[in-house]
Amino acid sequence: MDDKSMARGRKAFVTGFPIRHSRSPLIHGFWLKELGIDGSYEAVEVKPEDFSSFAASLAANGFAGGNVTIPHKEAAYAAAESLDEAARAIGAVNTLWLENGRLCGGNTDAYGFAANLDASAPGWDKADRALVLGAGGASRAVVHALLSRGVCHVSVVNRTLSRAEELAAHFGARVYAHGWDEAQALVSNAGLIVNTTALGMSGHGEGQDFPIDLTCAPKEAVATDIVYVPLRTAFLNKAEKAGLKTVDGLGMLLHQAVPGFERWFGQRPQVTQALREHILADMAKAGAL
């Protein structure tokens, strides 16, 4: 039996609350059509108080697995009977699948972050030092990716220093916590600068200048933002003006979807320019560029 036959009729999902904003159905729908797989992928809105029962009834509802987004990632972590290494390190699950009747959880955000940089800025992981702006939940996946790829020194800057200290304590050696007032000084020797904050994101002061001067960064430094709405954030615009190589956050969204699709439908999809343009067209239609 070939992979297409095995995947026939398989169902997967993305769940969050709310979930109508998600572009995951567009991504997976594109791949299902491209690969000729007779499967489905749908958005399912689940309230926080209903998540545990939803996760427990995946098989009964005919699902092979699915993606989990805000606010359910920690609840999915707790619900999973088995966790992959990335999920354990990050403390959150964004991908669920069934294996011999057991609910398994993984986290593909770190993979997506690194794969996006591999595609758009090959050699990025030769940087000895990385600067991560922000210490929220998303920064954990970024830090895990950096450590996994051998970055020697990761500085995490956050307005509330205690949040950065918690993150540094979680990951241990090679991760260092700093207050926001130290960010400017840290730029000068950072080979990779990652923005995980909402500064410049739609509804968070878009159009405003990013409050850090990037002209003192090494000329070979790479700047990347995990935000993809808007596609060109204030941070990326400032980095581009400073002459740095920039990588937007859309690729992370696309690449993080790959491992889950392969688990549910049995074929590994490709992140192509055609897929990117498909999502960009939807973003333009929604006024999200």
Swiss-Prot record:
<protein>
    <recommendedName>
        <fullName>Shikimate dehydrogenase (NADP(+))</fullName>
        <ecNumber>1.1.1.25</ecNumber>
    </recommendedName>
</protein>
<dbReference type="InterPro" id="IPR041121">
    <property type="entry name" value="SDH_C"/>
</dbReference>
<feature type="binding site">
    <location>
        <begin position="158"/>
        <end position="163"/>
    </location>
    <ligand>
        <name>NADP(+)</name>
    </ligand>
</feature>
<comment type="subunit">
    <text>Homodimer.</text>
</comment>
<feature type="binding site">
    <location>
        <position position="69"/>
    </location>
    <ligand>
        <name>shikimate</name>
    </ligand>
</feature>
<feature type="binding site">
    <location>
        <position position="85"/>
    </location>
    <ligand>
        <name>NADP(+)</name>
    </ligand>
</feature>
<feature type="binding site">
    <location>
        <position position="226"/>
    </location>
    <ligand>
        <name>NADP(+)</name>
    </ligand>
</feature>
<feature type="active site" description="Proton acceptor">
    <location>
        <position position="73"/>
    </location>
</feature>
<dbReference type="GO" id="GO:0004764">
    <property type="term" value="F:shikimate 3-dehydrogenase (NADP+) activity"/>
</dbReference>
<dbReference type="Pfam" id="PF08501">
    <property type="entry name" value="Shikimate_dh_N"/>
</dbReference>
<feature type="binding site">
    <location>
        <position position="249"/>
    </location>
    <ligand>
        <name>NADP(+)</name>
    </ligand>
</feature>
<feature type="binding site">
    <location>
        <position position="228"/>
    </location>
    <ligand>
        <name>shikimate</name>
    </ligand>
</feature>
<comment type="similarity">
    <text>Belongs to the shikimate dehydrogenase family.</text>
</comment>
<feature type="binding site">
    <location>
        <position position="109"/>
    </location>
    <ligand>
        <name>shikimate</name>
    </ligand>
</feature>
<dbReference type="GO" id="GO:0019632">
    <property type="term" value="P:shikimate metabolic process"/>
</dbReference>
<feature type="binding site">
    <location>
        <position position="94"/>
    </location>
    <ligand>
        <name>shikimate</name>
    </ligand>
</feature>
<dbReference type="Pfam" id="PF01488">
    <property type="entry name" value="Shikimate_DH"/>
</dbReference>
<dbReference type="InterPro" id="IPR006151">
    <property type="entry name" value="Shikm_DH/Glu-tRNA_Rdtase"/>
</dbReference>
<dbReference type="InterPro" id="IPR036291">
    <property type="entry name" value="NAD(P)-bd_dom_sf"/>
</dbReference>
<dbReference type="InterPro" id="IPR022893">
    <property type="entry name" value="Shikimate_DH_fam"/>
</dbReference>
<dbReference type="Pfam" id="PF18317">
    <property type="entry name" value="SDH_C"/>
</dbReference>
<comment type="function">
    <text>Involved in the biosynthesis of the chorismate, which leads to the biosynthesis of aromatic amino acids. Catalyzes the reversible NADPH linked reduction of 3-dehydroshikimate (DHSA) to yield shikimate (SA).</text>
</comment>
<feature type="binding site">
    <location>
        <begin position="22"/>
        <end position="24"/>
    </location>
    <ligand>
        <name>shikimate</name>
    </ligand>
</feature>
<dbReference type="InterPro" id="IPR011342">
    <property type="entry name" value="Shikimate_DH"/>
</dbReference>
<dbReference type="GO" id="GO:0009073">
    <property type="term" value="P:aromatic amino acid family biosynthetic process"/>
</dbReference>
<dbReference type="InterPro" id="IPR046346">
    <property type="entry name" value="Aminoacid_DH-like_N_sf"/>
</dbReference>
<feature type="binding site">
    <location>
        <begin position="134"/>
        <end position="138"/>
    </location>
    <ligand>
        <name>NADP(+)</name>
    </ligand>
</feature>
<keyword id="KW-0057">Aromatic amino acid biosynthesis</keyword>
<dbReference type="InterPro" id="IPR013708">
    <property type="entry name" value="Shikimate_DH-bd_N"/>
</dbReference>
<comment type="pathway">
    <text>Metabolic intermediate biosynthesis; chorismate biosynthesis; chorismate from D-erythrose 4-phosphate and phosphoenolpyruvate: step 4/7.</text>
</comment>
<keyword id="KW-0028">Amino-acid biosynthesis</keyword>
<keyword id="KW-0560">Oxidoreductase</keyword>
<dbReference type="GO" id="GO:0009423">
    <property type="term" value="P:chorismate biosynthetic process"/>
</dbReference>
<dbReference type="GO" id="GO:0008652">
    <property type="term" value="P:amino acid biosynthetic process"/>
</dbReference>
<dbReference type="GO" id="GO:0050661">
    <property type="term" value="F:NADP binding"/>
</dbReference>
<keyword id="KW-0521">NADP</keyword>
<dbReference type="GO" id="GO:0005829">
    <property type="term" value="C:cytosol"/>
</dbReference>
